[in-house]
């Protein structure tokens, strides 16, 4: 199975399955002499891990990361950093009913058709549980970006179902508020509506989609490698690689269809840009403005409402998904999206520094 790595100079490779012994990753390209320990990584994992609130899956996992290599006496050595997270709260028996059935809307069918075999326990490799290691690697990238370049990568949930937050001025977002509620939401009035919606969904045994935004501030000018490794292209690639993501927007995204050139162009003065419709990227290269990316996540198909599907013999069957699942996968996707953004930014920063130097 290919496709387990991302990045060139800062390269992340993950391995492991939802109900396997452990998850792991190898991170290559971390510059030497950066102070690093598990304590630097754990906070982001705690934001993503299951069972932290009544709005997410009740599966309980400590998600305690262990650094295996690449750190000596509290500092990175420049060699590969290996990390693992052991799986604990496994209830594989919940998935016995789908051993020979395909869950609608999941990767069961495509994995079986491609490989002729699949780990049906919680989706195996296709489970969002794998993203724990992306968050671990992303925490390293975020730390280096913050300490060496002052770059901050943060995200917030902007919509669940038809409930939208109030329009946000990026420079005025209260990030303390975002981290102080289980929805990663900057709008307290929307938090209350999110709460009501999720409660109803759990009663109905149903799920819902979501939209979230990632903001990277203080990004240096010049990151991106036109024409095929444009910064926005690589960000879209990384964010689309997150489970359940069905759309990515950079800057104003699809809204540009209704804009005129006089409105959309980000005019400039000696003091800087007058707007940021482009989302901090022009010609595939960072402008120095905040980089803004928004992703849409589909509603999970793991619901208790009966649905039609087929089995391995292509016979029609009815399926009720058992196990423990999120009514809205977008809630826990915020730290994942932050991690993928940070991984791409650090990779491009190292590539830019290698070719052009940093001014």
From Swiss-Prot:
Record InterPro entries: Chorismate_synth, Chorismate_synth_AroC_sf, Chorismate_synthase_CS
Database matches in SUPFAM superfamilies: Chorismate synthase, AroC
GO cellular component: cytosol
Biological-process GO terms, alphabetical: amino acid biosynthetic process; aromatic amino acid family biosynthetic process; chorismate biosynthetic process
EC numbers for this chain: 4.2.3.5
Catalytic activity line of the entry: 5-O-(1-carboxyvinyl)-3-phosphoshikimate = chorismate + phosphate
An example Gene Ontology molecular-function term: chorismate synthase activity
Binding residue positions for NADP(+): 48, 54
Residues that hold FMN according to the record: 125-127, 243-244, 283, 298-302, 324
Cofactor binding, note field: Reduced FMN (FMNH(2)).
Keywords linked to the UniProt accession: Amino-acid biosynthesis, Aromatic amino acid biosynthesis, FAD, Flavoprotein, FMN, Lyase, NADP
Cofactor(s) named in the record: FMNH2
Family: Belongs to the chorismate synthase family.
Complex formation: Homotetramer.
Name of the protein in its database record: Chorismate synthase
Organism: Mannheimia succiniciproducens (strain KCTC 0769BP / MBEL55E)
Originating gene: aroC
């Amino acid at each position: 199975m290919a496709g387990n790595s991302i990045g060139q100079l800062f390269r992340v490779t993950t391995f492991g399955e939802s109900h396997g012994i452990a998850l792991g990753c190898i991170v290559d390209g971390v510059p030497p002499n950066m102070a690093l320990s598990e304590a630097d990584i754990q906070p982001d994992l705690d934001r993503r891990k299951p069972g932290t609130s009544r709005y997410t899956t009740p599966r309980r996992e400590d998600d305690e990361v262990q650094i295996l290599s690449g750190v000596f006496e509290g500092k990175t050595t420049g060699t590969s950093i290996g990390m693992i997270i052991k799986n604990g709260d496994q209830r594989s028996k919940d998935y016995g009913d789908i051993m020979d059935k395909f869950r609608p809307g999941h990767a069961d069918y495509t994995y079986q058709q491609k490989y002729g075999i699949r780990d049906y326990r919680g989706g195996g490799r296709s489970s969002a549980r794998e993203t724990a290691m992306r968050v671990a690697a992303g925490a390293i990238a975020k730390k280096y970006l913050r300490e060496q370049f002052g770059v901050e990568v943060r995200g917030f949930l902007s919509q669940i179902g038809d409930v939208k937050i109030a329009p946000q001025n990026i420079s005025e977002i209260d990030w303390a508020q975002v981290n102080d509620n289980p929805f990663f939401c900057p709008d307290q009035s929307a938090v209350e509506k999110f709460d009501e919606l999720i409660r109803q969904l759990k009663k109905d045994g149903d799920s819902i989609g979501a939209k979230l935004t990632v903001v990277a501030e203080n990004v240096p000018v010049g990151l991106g490698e036109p024409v095929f490794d444009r910064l926005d292209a690589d960000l879209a690639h990384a964010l689309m690689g997150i489970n359940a993501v069905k759309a990515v927007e950079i800057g104003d995204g699809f809204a540009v269809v209704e804009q005129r050139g006089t409105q959309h162009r980000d005019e400039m003065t000696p003091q800087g840009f007058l707007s940021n419709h482009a989302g901090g990227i022009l010609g595939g290269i960072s402008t120095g403005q905040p980089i803004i990316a928004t992703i849409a996540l589909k509603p999970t198909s793991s619901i208790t409402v009966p649905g039609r599907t087929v089995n391995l013999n292509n016979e029609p069957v009815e399926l009720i998904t058992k196990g423990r699942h999120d009514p809205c996968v977008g809630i826990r996707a915020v730290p994942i999206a932050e991690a993928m953004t940070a991984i791409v930014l650090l990779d491009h920063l190292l590539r830019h520094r290698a070719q052009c130097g940093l001014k």
